């Protein structure tokens, strides 16, 4: 790996893509490529000017295949369909990939797992350092409380977010379920209305809020008799997500082919709970 890895940004024309370009520059790494949709009117524009940091000499392109040779690793915050295509191209080129795309189907996740047998892949629903530390705290709380509490996950995002619950909320739920030896698909309850009957303590509840410009807020409640513990993470801007993804990209270059997550990047798997 070179001292300054060449990082490509996929979905560079979107809000997150522009922040990722800023994050690459702030970290002192090299922007290898910036890719937008093939039909985008932004093709040919300078990526730095688009991101508001001035000209950097990297032009936006609509073809990942044409610029992969300029990248040691790419960061993908696009759509599930686009990510599937990007995985194929990266596998063929032997280029590592960091994926922040949410809303992927089980079939698409299986494609990701297969690709990770051939190239290093980092996949996380949330690249914030704070969120990943929060998940470690959730594992500790779940281990201590066990079956003595009711568990609820509440998440809030801006009105434009199209998937619910958020990938981060599901990631939190999965961490708790795994710690308790449960299958999240079997115990998750999404919203409640009407006559629901008494709450089953084995379930993990999810509630979703959408409105305004909320960047991202997640609270997990461990509710017992006479006391309640809450673990909350609130994001006030998106740079923390971008900085974490760039950190993951620099970390994964040169690693062996397999699937990693932010706990690997941050060394949290070595922290015992």
Swiss-Prot record:
It is an enzyme of class 1 (oxidoreductase). Disulfide bonds: none annotated. NADP(+) binds at residue 37. (S)-2,3,4,5-tetrahydrodipicolinate binds at residues 158, 167-168. It holds the Pfam family DapB_C. It catalyses: (S)-2,3,4,5-tetrahydrodipicolinate + NAD(+) + H2O = (2S,4S)-4-hydroxy-2,3,4,5-tetrahydrodipicolinate + NADH + H(+); (S)-2,3,4,5-tetrahydrodipicolinate + NADP(+) + H2O = (2S,4S)-4-hydroxy-2,3,4,5-tetrahydrodipicolinate + NADPH + H(+). One of its GO terms (biological process) is lysine biosynthetic process via diaminopimelate. Keywords: Amino-acid biosynthesis, Cytoplasm, Diaminopimelate biosynthesis, Lysine biosynthesis, NAD, NADP, Oxidoreductase. GO terms for molecular function: 4-hydroxy-tetrahydrodipicolinate reductase; NAD binding; NADP binding; oxidoreductase activity, acting on CH or CH2 groups, NAD or NADP as acceptor. The active site is at 157 (proton donor/acceptor), 161 (proton donor). NAD(+) binds at residues 11-16, 100-102, 124-127. Gene3D superfamilies: Dihydrodipicolinate Reductase, domain 2, NAD(P)-binding Rossmann-like Domain. One of its GO terms (cellular component) is cytosol. Its EC number is 1.17.1.8. It is found in: Cytoplasm. Its main location: cytoplasm. Coiled coil: none annotated. Pathway: Amino-acid biosynthesis; L-lysine biosynthesis via DAP pathway; (S)-tetrahydrodipicolinate from L-aspartate: step 4/4. InterPro entries: DapB_C, DapB_N, DapB_N_CS, DHDPR_bac, NAD(P)-bd_dom_sf. HAMAP family: DapB (MF_00102). Belongs to the DapB family. Catalyzes the conversion of 4-hydroxy-tetrahydrodipicolinate (HTPA) to tetrahydrodipicolinate. This is 4-hydroxy-tetrahydrodipicolinate reductase. The lineage of its organism: Bacteria, Pseudomonadati, Pseudomonadota, Gammaproteobacteria, Moraxellales. The gene is dapB.
């Amino acid at each position: 790996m070179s001292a300054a890895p060449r990082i490509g940004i996929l979905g560079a024309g979107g809000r997150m893509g522009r922040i990722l370009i800023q994050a690459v520059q702030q970290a002192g790494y090299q922007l290898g490529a910036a890719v937008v949709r093939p039909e985008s009117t932004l093709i040919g524009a300078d990526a730095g000017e688009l991101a508001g940091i001035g000209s950097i000499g990297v032009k936006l392109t609509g073809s990942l295949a044409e610029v992969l040779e300029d990248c040691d690793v790419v960061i993908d915050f696009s759509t599930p369909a686009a990510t599937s295509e990007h995985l194929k191209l990266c596998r063929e080129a032997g280029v590592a990939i960091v994926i922040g795309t949410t809303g992927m189907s089980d079939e698409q996740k299986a494609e990701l797992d297969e690709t990770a047998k051939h190239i290093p892949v980092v996949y996380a629903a949330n690249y914030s350092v704070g969120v990943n530390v929060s998940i470690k705290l959730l594992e500790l709380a779940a281990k201590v409380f066990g079956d003595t509490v009711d568990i609820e996950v509440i998440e809030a995002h801006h009105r434009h977010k199209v998937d619910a619950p958020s990938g981060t909320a599901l990631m939190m739920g999965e961490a708790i379920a795994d710690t308790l030896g449960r299958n999240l698909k079997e115990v998750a309850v999404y919203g409640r209305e009407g006559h629901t009957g008494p709450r089953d303590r084995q379930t993990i509840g999810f509630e979703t809020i959408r409105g305004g410009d909320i960047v991202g807020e997640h609270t997990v409640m461990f509710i017992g008799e006479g006391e309640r513990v809450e673990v909350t993470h609130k994001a006030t801007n998106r740079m923390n997500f971008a900085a974490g993804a760039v950190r993951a990209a620099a970390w994964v270059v040169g690693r062996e082919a397999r699937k990693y997550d932010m706990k690997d990047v941050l060394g949290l798997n070595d922290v015992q709970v």
